[in-house]
Amino acid sequence: MSAPTPPQTGQFQVATSAQRSPVAVNIVNYLFQNPILKQRTGLLDNTNDIEFFRFKRLQRALLSDDYKQKQQNPKNGLIPVANNEDVQKVFVLLIQNQLLLPLQKLHYAEVKAVKGWKPNKEKPTLKRADKAVMDPDVYYGWLYQKPNPYILLYSFLAIAGVFAVILFPLWPNFMKRGVWYLSMGALGLIALFFATAIVRLIIYIISLVAFPKPFWLFPNLFEDCGVIESFQPVYAWEEPKKKKGKKKKEPKLEVVEEKVGSSSGDVKVTGSELSNGSSTTGKRKVTLEEVEE
């Protein structure tokens, strides 16, 4: 199956398909998590995680020597891409199979203007764009999750674990003793954790009276971090909270909700709707717009 040929006009409509073609899936398997894309994790509609990248990175990945080398192997099922025209064909193919979602990156003020949304320092907030534009700096996100190659192994281990628990009465005595020692060790660690939490709380209460600044033992113990980071640093002094000054009122930005549908003869692109971490597919038309560099 070859990639569709886009018309020569600036805007054109592409009908999407609910059934994904093997060629499109093979291309996405190559592109997904490709280092050339430099893809990052963002928040779609300030809720769901989505991997996104710029269109120019997609062009570079498809025109790279690595892609040409992988394409020569018939097992990979990749179609040849020689120039920007071929890149556009692949791009249209991915849009048709609902594997790409055009996105718009929001600024801090735009996120704050939406009721219920909160800016995230680590993950930028994104929303669906009206059109899929072939512009180098336009953002696109993946509507695809690469299948886990170890899923069968995990399933087998889970079944083996269930049978091992069921057959516990038939275990030899040395295995039963080993499980007992392990369980006692785990309970000891849990008891030590609670004891540490109680001791640090007592020290903190005493420091409120005895010292000018409150003292914390293991200040990151209950923070959202790794096990080792929870015990680093060993101690810290709590800094007093700064009083917030009066801020000037910023003009409110008008928020306009996006609608998927046709307007003045153009059909807007949103890709698949994502809600509560799930995606739904359906047949609809897509408007693609080329921008001359």
UniProtKB/Swiss-Prot annotation:
Lumenal membrane side: 172-185
Location within or outside the cell: Endoplasmic reticulum membrane
Keyword Cytoplasm attributed: no
Alphabetic keyword roster: Endoplasmic reticulum, Membrane, Protein transport, Translocation, Transmembrane, Transmembrane helix, Transport
Membrane topology, Cytoplasmic segments: 1-150, 207-293
GO molecular function: protein transmembrane transporter activity
Biased composition range(s): Polar residues: 272-281
BP terms from Gene Ontology: post-translational protein targeting to membrane, translocation
GO cellular component terms given for this protein: endoplasmic reticulum; membrane; plasma membrane; Sec62/Sec63 complex; translocon complex
Principal location: endoplasmic reticulum
Coiled-coil regions, chain positions: none
UniProt KW Kinase keyword: no
Region (Disordered) residue spans: 240-293
Membrane topology: Multi-pass membrane protein
Free-text function comment from the UniProt entry: Required for preprotein translocation.
Entry's family note: Belongs to the SEC62 family.
Quaternary structure and partners: Part of a complex that contains SEC61, SEC62, SEC63, SEC66 and SEC72.
UniProt protein name: Translocation protein SEC62
